[in-house]
Amino acid sequence: MVTFVAECEKKSLNRTRRVLDAFANRIGSRSWQTVITNEGLHAVKKLLRKTASKNTAVSCHWIRSRSRSELVWIVGNRKKFNSEGMVPVNYTDAVMDSFIDKQQWKTASTIQYAAAISALFHDFGKANELFQNKIDPSKKANRFEPYRHEWISLRLFQSFVGDKTDAQWLDELSQISPDSISDCFQDGVDGNLADNHPLLNLPPFAKLVAWLVLAHHKLPIYPKWKENLAPAPSLREVRGWIGKNFDAVWNSHNCKDQDQQALIEQNWKLKELPLASMQWRSQACMIASKARVKLQLWSQQEQDIDWLNDQLFTAHLSRLSLMLSDHHYSAQQQVTQEWRGPSYSAYANSDRKSKQLKQKLDEHLIGVSHHAEKIAKALPKLNGSLQQLEPNRTFTESVPKEFKDKFGWQDRATKIARSVSKESVEGGFFGVNMASTGRGKTLANAKIMAALATETGRARFSVALGLRTLTLQTGREYREQLNLTDEELSIAVGGVAVRQLFENEQNRNRRERKQSAEEQSNTDRGSESEDEFLDSELYVDYKGERYPHSLSDWTRGNERLEKLLLAPVLVSTIDHLMPATEGTKGGKQIGAMLRLLTSDLVLDEPDDFGLKDLPALCRLVHWSGMLGSRVLLST
């Protein structure tokens, strides 16, 4: 027998009553009771979720005996009930340390304004003559650019900042004029990079913004597959690579090819910059003014912060916000007239199908900046807006007495995990679960992760399996073993990431060479940002409702990304999470990063990896910790 209690408000109460009246007897104005099968209960939950809104709050209690009931699930607003499903009769205000973020989002304002300001400059380089001719369908122009638009944008931003401090260039941006950028250093024309490094001499916040401008499509990679270049720098030089080894060729792989040299001067011939657009200048003034007030970065202590190298969380969440915004706005079919300067003529991209010019450059920059700021604001709310694992007896019940000898260790492990739950909120968690085959590690892993979530009450985790084959069948067996539904556990299968991440060096160079050639065709339209985030062969088995969350406005158009994100538990092979650290271009890191940002991580039997793969595994563990995940290694 079960009892339903509805604490719904407004129209949601009537919708809830219609659903529950069809399955149970109403025993009060907001309560129902009935005898029901497990399948029937699952159907009720599914129907309630389908009609749920922010005003919905329904709890279901299983009457176990005359003196005991157990909370089965809650649909909707969990704040209407406590952890046992009881309805509060009074409220008390108190400072709850476990719900205050003292660590992860301290730099939320920096992320927000770094993303918004870099978005204003990220495509400045598209105003060059070669690019404008390339995307214009009425002109049969050369399709190649020696220097990519990101590199030219970087040089233009560097020219704007000059030798100013962060406070000074933000002040100038807040009152920018059409002639604030008159010229910039031209690689291949004015000399070598050693004569004028684009990053080294910038102040800390400007260096972060410049990096985002440079890396908004892809991270710099040395093209070691090209035969006309010096050998790739040694890994030993990694700490000082920006100062010693960095060059335009890391971004623009073809800039030193002989057949490109005749195009260089045209590449640097700039048409009207977005500075000429009153709409762009208005947006820049507004963003810079807010940033100058909100960001208290200019004390002597914080001026010494290296935002690019020492604040990886800030740098990469800013980049994620910028790339997700660029992808979102580039895909829009409707133009935004109020963001277009009436006399501004440069374009940012063309339509993939019709090949016709689509978004004006000033409109595109304003749109991406607008959405980047909103995405960065929404990121801290993402975890709280996603559904967590419902109370599950499989994870909380002790091992039966008859199985204590073989599986009793699970109870001890769960108890230890629960005891460090509060500590792990602030200090993180890395655990190793070692047990022989057949001792129930799979179930124990889930119990441990649920116990670690005791303090916050939010259990969400991803199980990353080794490179053995994961099929839908084995994934569904995993689901049954944990006693979870297809709404609570999603399975990611397919894709070619394994082959690409762990292939040998020769094959990797061959693939990079091929992709470098294909890259050019994608840039012909100026629409690289529309490329897919996820592998086209990836399939995610998830039957839950696609409910709203803080990033819904920017992810709802990507069904597979939504499915990867929404389920409380994800089971996949490890390569589907590896792009968080190994993905270098096209936003491939975004899906995995959002998953790690909103769930803990279980590395289950990573025995298929050799010593050569350990750096990639270590990067994944480091990244998970940086994004706030608790990590458990099971072997």
Model-derived features with residue positions:
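Walker A/P-loop
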Residues: V425-M449, E605, F609-K612, S634
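Conserved SF1/SF2 helicase motif Ia
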Residues: I448-R476, N483-E487, G625-R630
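N-terminal accessory nucleic-acid engagement/regulatory domains that precede
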Residues: M1-E70, G76, F99-I100, D183-V399
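A substrate-engagement module of RecA-like helicase motors
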Residues: R479-P568, I574-H576
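Conserved pre-motif I regulatory segment
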Residues: Y113, Q387-M434
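Short basic/glycine-enriched coil/helix segment immediately N-terminal to the Walker B
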Residues: Q112-Y113, K422-G427, E559-A567, T584-L601
